[in-house]
Amino acid sequence: MTELALILVSAILVNNFVLVQFLGLCPFMGVSRKIETAIGLSLATTFVLTLAAMCSHILQRYVLRPLDLEYLRTIGFILVIAVVVQFTEMLVKKTSPLLYRVLGIFLPLITTNCIVLGVALLNANKAEYGFLQATTQGFGAGLGFSLVLVLFAALRERIAIADVPAPFRGAAIGMITAGLMSLAFMGFSGLVRP
């Protein structure tokens, strides 16, 4: 139980996939203008990350490794992620048509979000991870992505009404804000030993 808690805290704060490992930066910068959109995408991404971590672990452990087909890992994981994203898209469309319209093109683009493939590949490289650890890592990565995306969206909403000097408006202030958030998350680096 302690190991799972450490994996969760590590994925959310210490080794945050967005601010520490720089994965998932496209949706981080692109969908963070409004907090409602950020919440919707973060929930969908967390769901996809968790399911993709589960499915890719099963694929790696019970198909690719026993059959000595590990060289097909990336292609297999991309196919698994595509199926999980399609399932998520259908689920969101049925349960929340408004959220489906708000997310628009960003929902199918979760397939190409590098954080999803990155988590699957990192889990596959950790041979000591069992099913629960891989799932916890995926869920923690999703929670970390959600935390950072919602915080960044809230900051961008505040910055949008602030008096920002002309040269810093738009992407420039966004990058500065992301850098400051990354520095803040560096403070968690001593929380969990490697």
Swiss-Prot record:
Which terms are listed as keywords in the entry?
A: Cell inner membrane, Cell membrane, Electron transport, Membrane, Translocase, Transmembrane, Transmembrane helix, Transport
Disulphide linkage map: none
* GO biological process terms held by the UniProt record: electron transport chain
Q: Where in the cell is it found?
A: Cell inner membrane
Its EC number(s): 7.-.-.-
Superkingdom per UniProt = Bacteria
The record gives the membrane topology as: Multi-pass membrane protein
Carries keyword Transmembrane helix?
yes
Question: Transmembrane ranges?
Answer: 4-24, 39-59, 72-92, 102-122, 135-155, 172-192
Gene Ontology CC annotation, any one: plasma membrane
Query: Where does it mainly reside?
Result: membrane
The subunit structure is:
The complex is composed of six subunits: RnfA, RnfB, RnfC, RnfD, RnfE and RnfG.
Q: Which family does it belong to?
A: Belongs to the NqrDE/RnfAE family.
What does this protein's UniProt record list under function?
Part of a membrane-bound complex that couples electron transfer with translocation of ions across the membrane.
Record protein name field: Ion-translocating oxidoreductase complex subunit A
The species this protein belongs to is: Pseudomonas aeruginosa (strain ATCC 15692 / DSM 22644 / CIP 104116 / JCM 14847 / LMG 12228 / 1C / PRS 101 / PAO1)
**UniProt gene name:** rnfA
